[in-house]
Amino acid sequence: MLKIGVIADDFTGATDIASFLVENGMPTVQINDVPTGTQPEGCDAVVISLKTRSCPVQEAIKQSLAALVWLKKQGCQQVYFKYCSTFDSTAEGNIGPVTDALMVALDTSFTVISPALPVNGRTVYQGYLFVMNHLLAESGMRHHPINPMTDSYLPRLMEAQAQGRCGVIPAQTLDEGVAATRAALSRLQQEGYRYAVLDALNERHLEIQGEVLRDAPLVTGGSGLAMGLARQWAKHGVSQARSAGYPLSGRAVVLSGSCSQMTNQQVAFYRQHAPTRDVDVARCLSSETREAYAEALAQWVLSQDSELAPMISATASTQALAAIQQQYGATEASHAVEALFSLLAARLTEGGITRFIVAGGGNPGGGAQNPGITGFYIGPGLFPRGAGGNAPPAPGSPAPKTGKFWGGTFFFPAPKGVLSLFHNSQPPR
């Protein structure tokens, strides 16, 4: 029986949480879009990757509920709504409405909000979300092109977009242990609160959360809480959980479409060392020119014989992105580039590329969501944000990287386990 079913609001975020589940002993499969078949064999957890972070609210609710229906048919014991550790949801955002819809469908009147990921500097204290010791609203997320985060107080953010009151379980309570945390949650529920933000400053806080929430029908948060829950659920060793998803050998390509500040730095550095082509948005807009353009880019990638993987980049600076959106329309440009990456990935797979390093969960995420790849057995994590995996039934190993994470040299140089993905050689096991 399926223990945990995750409904993730973007592609790379889905892989993030899947890697945390695997690293803590739960064999995990990630599935692109709402599944139609039965549960894959040999897994304790399934992560369904949607693209609902920034779509219209009703569409986000529709897709999330469809994913929930499938999970319930598989006998899923716990549902986990996964969003980013930087929350990425304004007053007009989707986290609140999707959470409310899931609560109704699961007939539960109370749930938690736990975006913290301390290993990556995302902590919550007194209900305030911090990014590398800076308040969320004072970080680079304040200028996010799609979901600018101008408030750091999670209860206020949640109440602005959801249908109830939101309380806080402070770090001091978590420090007191499982019993104190469980009692504090019970008090909030009795007082009529619908949601509780959980502070988390360290891994121990996440472990306590996992023990307290082991039997909750619905939890919501980032990847950090998954660590605590997996340690409660896991009956397998980490090596067994990892084994199905070790990356394949063969040629690699980098597809970058995130426009975050961090990805801009990473792309700028990597292009100094590896062959790079920038995406021309104008050539992506119509289906006729897009197909021809995807073929031309594929031929260029396949013709490269460099030691490091060639890169196709749609990453743009804030100023350049604004100009593109003004000229072509934000939605139109985004969808056009996403369609290009999907065509390109399919063509590259046909051409023998087996490893895809994907930066960002939107546009490039389409690259790993091409029609030949329906899901992934998740393998060992490359970093606390980023994982490798194998895709059944199509041969391929994606390594998604969330756009806003890791230093400017993520792509190169990198530790041996990651760098192997960028070399056209056999990755280590």
Q: Can you annotate each of these PLM segments?
A:
Residues 353-354, 362-404, 410-411:
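Conserved, well-ordered active-site substructure
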